[in-house]
Amino acid sequence: MKSIYRSLGKIHVCYSAPLHTSVEDHWVSATFASPTNKPITERQPTMIDREIELQTKDGAMNTFVTHPEEEGPHPVILLLMDAPGKREELHDMARRLGTAGYYVMLPNLYYRRVREFKIQESSREVMHEHMASLSNAMICEDIQSLIDFADEESAARDGKMGCVGYCMSGPFAFAAAAKFSDRIAASASFHGVYLYSDKEDSPHLDAEMITGEMYFGCAETDEYAPKKMVDGLENYLRGTNLNSRIEWYPDTEHGFVFPKRGDKYHKKSAERHWERLFAMYRRCL
């Protein structure tokens, strides 16, 4: 396993206990497990799920929101969808973050073109058209709308927030960390594409603006995020003061974190991805 650290100070990596969740309608009960795998029954948070219509200058952005019912306000985390779109699989991932004590927002980034996108019912060409319609600047405008909404929510805590992107949204999470450096204190990209490129808006160009922590989780075999791209990013970041980490996940392919990705799913690595996220958010938020 190859792990590369770039930090202004020492990073202490901690491991989160697994969460076991059961979902029924819009209410979630969670039982936490201790490092010894003995249930901790003292705290079983009730989760609130809802869909909101968040108004932006380009229209209504349907967004899934989940957070614990009590003990708020909670730090905000923005979970940015991958190319197949906002779906129940991602809702469950948002819930897993939320049960740890976060206010999680999952927006439909394709809202300018379609309210719901289901890859099973559409061709990959349509998906690629949706992807090509987006830009880092557009997504940052959407994130500003998400921040504005969260700032008015009593269950959402003001101040430092987190972000995570997958696949196509990896560069969005990278760009957002720079654009909103006063708010985003911890951001992560998993099997992110175009993190380092010759595009005019390549997110690596603004890396020096990031004041928070940045994590990049990379699949060992990834035709969409090849080693050459990641190596270029690594070399570039060596010349910056960005508090960052690039970590390779052995024996994995693009999409390894998603349980419904068939044989691409790699459970051990997917759990490590959760450990890295929870540890970073605990450190920074």
Language-model regions, residue ranges each:
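N-terminal cap/leader regions of alpha/beta-hydrolase-fold enzymes
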Residues: 5, 9-12, 21-26, 32, ...
